[in-house]
Amino acid sequence: MSDISKASLPKAIFLMGPTASGKTALAIELRKILPVELISVDSALIYKGMDIGTAKPNAEELLAVPHRLLDIRDPSQAYSAADFRRDALAEMADITAAGRIPLLVGGTMLYFKALLEGLSPLPSADPEVRARIEQQAAEQGWESLHRQLQEVDPVAAARIHPNDPQRLSRALEVFFISGKTLTELTQTSGDALPYQVHQFAIAPASRELLHQRIEQRFHQMLASGFEAEVRALFARGDLHTDLPSIRCVGYRQMWSYLEGEISYDEMVYRGVCATRQLAKRQITWLRGWEGVHWLDSEKPEQARDEVLQVVGAIAG
């Protein structure tokens, strides 16, 4: 697309970053200054009743600065990148029609990628194929299926852990249904995002600072009633660890504690470690991201001013 045709597109802002990097706080500050409306880009914040462990903005913050695409699914329901793209495009169109600018804030990089580049035409899930895969896993173990994936799609196998049955079974399912690998199909993108996007990433300057923030926030969540929140989900009886909601960082570890699999101290340790691993994956995504302007979360006023400097001209 030429620069001239790109300039004629409506404007949008991406504010990306790892967990515990201060994205939401900066977005709320920007909302006070710029003609923007916030859209959440977070695969955990979509779930109702999952507030403390996801660091969801509180009621007071949401009253002052509404966020779209929060609390749109029950934890028993799935929500795909395709679902997100559809919903986000509808919200962006609504915001643009009102003469304002969509500000998309979050850390689910797969959602940002799907929105920006479009989605490859993957086949829909097939219950029969999935059942066959799960039967094979029950008989031979997931390690055996991972070796099978390595033979047909080594690129996907290198990316998917043998202990991740959800992604492993999906990669095999795609191959069995279409005869093409997940890697082949995902190299074919769909429609690009019809917006002129200004992209920002916020993170602390050092990994140690981010690790400190993550540990501090996990303990704050525990002090705020995270265990009681997960106990309420646990007591429902219809939720389990195969669901994306309960596999969210922190929830999975607390669930193991409630099931008596691990001690409280082990839950805290694993929860902090899993959150750090998530942050590492998010930063790895962002380092390979083109056209992103990095902001230092330890200098919030400077970060805000840098965004205003870049975005101010388009918001005037």
Curated annotation (Swiss-Prot):
Function: Catalyzes the transfer of a dimethylallyl group onto the adenine at position 37 in tRNAs that read codons beginning with uridine, leading to the formation of N6-(dimethylallyl)adenosine (i(6)A).
Cofactor(s) demanded: Mg(2+)
Residues given in the record as substrate binding sites: T19, A20, S21, G22, K23, T24
Matching InterPro entries: Dimethylallyltransferase (IPR039657), IPT (IPR018022), P-loop_NTPase (IPR027417)
Molecular-function GO terms, alphabetical: ATP binding; tRNA dimethylallyltransferase activity
Protein name from the UniProt record: tRNA dimethylallyltransferase
Reaction(s) the record says it catalyses: adenosine(37) in tRNA + dimethylallyl diphosphate = N(6)-dimethylallyladenosine(37) in tRNA + diphosphate
Region (Interaction with substrate tRNA): 42-45, 166-170, 247-252, 280-287
Binding of ATP, residues: G17, P18, T19, A20, S21, G22, K23, T24
Organism: Shigella boydii serotype 18 (strain CDC 3083-94 / BS512)
Site (Interaction with substrate tRNA): T108, R130
Enzyme class of the recorded protein, top EC level: transferase
EC number: 2.5.1.75
Family: Belongs to the IPP transferase family.
Pfam families on file: IPPT
Keywords: ATP-binding, Magnesium, Nucleotide-binding, Transferase, tRNA processing
